[in-house]
Amino acid sequence: MRLNTLSPAEGSKKAGKRLGRGIGSGLGKTGGRGHKGQKSRSGGGVRRGFEGGQMPLYRRLPKFGFTSRKAAITAEVRLSDLAKVEGGVVDLNTLKAANIIGIQIEFAKVILAGEVTTPVTVRGLRVTKGARAAIEAAGGKIEE
């Protein structure tokens, strides 16, 4: 067996439709597009969301909400990630140095997810009630 002798199993690869190649092919002349109309023309068709001139759904419904610009610079930090920080002090800069949060992050909040085993000092970060209890139970402390 050689690479140049390999071929797919008989009948496993179906040939694509060859449109407009004569009446005998079954797909000649109009090529499966029917007669006349916008969809039969070259480049024909309507844009996404078009409902034939009726006011489309995306314009009938009211606008709502907004995209918070603060969300892009805020991060959640899991309790289990605190162990990845070198030294016992966790703040915004040490989290960035340990690649736990991105460089553009300005606010971080420690959440109760995973476990903290070593005592750590959390400085200048927001901390949830559950995370605060877990950090203090492990012998750590939170400084504002």
Curated annotation (Swiss-Prot):
<comment type="function">
    <text>Binds to the 23S rRNA.</text>
</comment>
<dbReference type="InterPro" id="IPR005749">
    <property type="entry name" value="Ribosomal_uL15_bac-type"/>
</dbReference>
<dbReference type="InterPro" id="IPR001196">
    <property type="entry name" value="Ribosomal_uL15_CS"/>
</dbReference>
<keyword id="KW-0699">rRNA-binding</keyword>
<feature type="compositionally biased region" description="Gly residues">
    <location>
        <begin position="21"/>
        <end position="31"/>
    </location>
</feature>
<keyword id="KW-0687">Ribonucleoprotein</keyword>
<dbReference type="GO" id="GO:0019843">
    <property type="term" value="F:rRNA binding"/>
</dbReference>
<dbReference type="Pfam" id="PF00828">
    <property type="entry name" value="Ribosomal_L27A"/>
</dbReference>
<dbReference type="GO" id="GO:0022625">
    <property type="term" value="C:cytosolic large ribosomal subunit"/>
</dbReference>
<protein>
    <recommendedName>
        <fullName>Large ribosomal subunit protein uL15</fullName>
    </recommendedName>
</protein>
<dbReference type="InterPro" id="IPR036227">
    <property type="entry name" value="Ribosomal_uL15/eL18_sf"/>
</dbReference>
<dbReference type="InterPro" id="IPR021131">
    <property type="entry name" value="Ribosomal_uL15/eL18"/>
</dbReference>
<comment type="subunit">
    <text>Part of the 50S ribosomal subunit.</text>
</comment>
<dbReference type="InterPro" id="IPR030878">
    <property type="entry name" value="Ribosomal_uL15"/>
</dbReference>
<comment type="similarity">
    <text>Belongs to the universal ribosomal protein uL15 family.</text>
</comment>
<feature type="region of interest" description="Disordered">
    <location>
        <begin position="1"/>
        <end position="54"/>
    </location>
</feature>
<dbReference type="GO" id="GO:0006412">
    <property type="term" value="P:translation"/>
</dbReference>
<dbReference type="GO" id="GO:0003735">
    <property type="term" value="F:structural constituent of ribosome"/>
</dbReference>
<keyword id="KW-0689">Ribosomal protein</keyword>
<keyword id="KW-0694">RNA-binding</keyword>
